[in-house]
A protein has these predicted regions:
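Short polar/charged helix/loop
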Residues: 1-142
Length: 142
């Protein structure tokens, strides 16, 4: 698993507020550096977890051949929570499972970009990211 953004400040450290939130959750973000999402990254990925519709739109415009790999992190977590017994057994089948469960994306799935938006947004984003990844991790490690 790795991270890349659609408007990355390539090489920059994690936003200080998000780095603080990561540290509170036991994650050392000191080595994290921003990188731009590229066709190569998308080509090598089995699944691309996005935070909002703007990410899906960017992939559709820039690399439409990889659009089928994109799913909202919140949507995937909600799908796996809704039908835990039908949940995925691997990252490679995650997209098929979300589609099979017929869970459509919704506004509640979105994780707002916390960059330079203050402590409250950073805390909310970090909490959502961790909670959603916990759901995926638990479902995919069964």
């Amino acid at each position: 698993m790795s991270s890349a953004g659609i408007a990355a400040l390539v090489g920059n450290e994690m936003d200080p507020l998000m780095a603080h939130e990561a540290a509170l959750r036991g994650i050392d973000a000191r080595k994290h550096r921003a990188r731009q999402l590229t066709g190569r990254i998308l080509k090598d990925a089995d699944v691309v977890l996005v935070f909002g519709p703007e990410h899906v739109e960017w992939i559709a415009n820039e690399y439409p051949e990889h659009l089928a790999k994109a799913v909202s992190l919140g949507q995937a977590a909600r799908a796996l929570q809704s039908r835990p017994r039908l949940a995925s057994s691997s990252w490679r089948t995650l997209l098929d499972d979300v589609q099979a469960l017929s869970v459509e994306p919704c506004e509640a799935d979105e994780i707002k970009d916390p960059y330079r938006r203050g402590e409250g947004i950073a805390k909310c984003a970090a909490g959502r990211i961790c909670a959603d990844l916990d759901v995926l991790s638990a479902a995919l490690s069964r």
